[in-house]
From Swiss-Prot:
The chain crosses the membrane at residues 10-30, 57-77, 79-99, 108-128, 150-170, 176-196, 216-236, 247-267, 279-299. Keywords: Cell membrane, Endosome, Ion transport, Magnesium, Membrane, Transmembrane, Transmembrane helix, Transport. It comes from Bos taurus. One of its GO terms (molecular function) is magnesium ion transmembrane transporter activity. GO terms for cellular component: early endosome; membrane; plasma membrane. This is Magnesium transporter NIPA2. Belongs to the NIPA family.
């Protein structure tokens, strides 16, 4: 792959990844509104295993929006490294957070806005330092990578962990612990990204006139992708139905991105030939995104905005002045009471003495 062609593919993948984030961020809002409408109608909720959302057009609109985003995301993996494409999902967090504040009445405070800004800055840093060229260009190379012992161990662990979460942990703690369903989506999502990457390579070879449809790996990747995406949709719906959208979206991003970067490092070894400064820059960008996501999530219930900064200061100042005034009044009252008591006591003693003298 020539350097010019590699950069051209890089920017195509970048544009597709950004458009994907916009579609996916909007899909969370549409699907959540559909689920809320069903809840008001008294239908069995998705978090309780219900599937009434299949009759709700808003949910289908959200699904189509997510589908468009996933198609763009799928295409992006064919042109750019997973280390670049996946972290740009932070834009979907930004889109979802802003739209949820307008359409779902989920407030976005100052901490959330700073978190969104940090997510964008972190994504920018990752784009700058991400690897610009792909090293896998054929299905045969992909097949060789999938047979690597490191990836086989990773895939086996993903399957085991997913089965335990789905059949053991999920029924017990899925309704109360947000991490259960999101972890299922994330670890399975790492495998789906690998499948999407392989299918993207297959499609590029198909347009080049190669007989990829006769390659067994093409159909294995397609079947695996369908199973993984179906599972992701199911458990993501449950998480969205039970928990706040502004919580689900950022946590899902962090878990999903971490899983994909780990899978990409094991399978594609994209980090192997990266300079040290690019590795440090990529990790710094990713941790910056995590800090932004934390601010967006941890302080979501705090009613705090930029305009409230001087107001709160004035309130504190008034409170201090008020407490000092109250203390001063109490001291004055006590002093007056003490003075009155002494005077009254003195008067009584004088009157008693006068009475005694009169008796004599």
């Amino acid at each position: 792959m020539s350097q010019g062609h590699g950069k051209y593919d890089f920017y195509i993948g970048l544009g597709l990844a950004m458009s994907s984030s916009i579609f996916i961020g909007g899909s969370f809002i549409l699907k959540k509104k559909g689920l809320l409408r069903l809840a008001r109608k008294g239908s069995t909720r998705a978090g309780q295993g219900g599937h009434a959302y299949l009759k709700e057009w808003l949910w289908w609109a959200g699904l189509l929006s997510m589908g468009a985003g996933e198609v763009a995301n799928f295409a992006a993996y064919a042109f750019a490294p997973a280390t670049l494409v996946t972290p740009l999902g932070a834009l979907s967090v930004l889109v979802s957070a802003i739209l949820s504040s307008y359409f779902l009445n989920e407030r976005l405070n100052l901490h959330g806005k700073i978190g969104c800004l940090l997510s964008i800055l972190g994504s920018t840093v990752m784009v700058i330092h991400a690897p610009k060229e792909e090293e896998i260009e054929t299905l045969n190379e992909m097949s060789h990578k999938l047979g690597d012992p490191g990836f086989v161990v990773f895939a086996t662990l993903v399957v085991i962990v997913s089965l335990i979460l789905i059949f053991v942990v999920g029924p017990r703690h899925g309704q109360t612990n947000i991490l259960v369903y999101i972890t299922i989506c994330s670890v399975i999502g790492a495998v789906s990204v690998s499948c999407a990457k392989g299918l993207g390579i297959a499609i590029k070879e198909l347009f080049a006139g190669k007989p990829v449809l006769q390659h067994p790996l093409t159909w294995i990747l397609l079947l695996s992708l369908i199973v993984c995406v179906s599972t992701q949709i199911n458990y993501l719906n449950r998480a969205l139905d039970i928990f706040n959208t502004s919580i689900v979206t950022p946590i899902y991003y962090v878990f999903f991105t971490t899983s994909v970067i780990t899978c990409s490092a094991i399978l594609f070894k994209e980090w192997q030939d990266m300079p040290v400064d690019d590795v440090i820059g990529t990790l710094s960008g990713f941790f910056t995104i995590i800090v932004g996501i934390f601010l967006l999530h941890a302080f979501k219930d705090v009613s705090f905005s930029l305009s409230s900064l001087p107001v709160s200061f004035r309130k504190d100042e008034k409170a201090v002045n008020g407490s000092l005034s109250s203390m001063y009044e109490v001291l004055n009252n006590n002093e007056e009471s003490l003075t009155c008591g002494i005077e009254q006591h003195t008067a009584e003693n004088i009157s008693r003495r006068n009475g005694n003298l009169t008796a004599f």
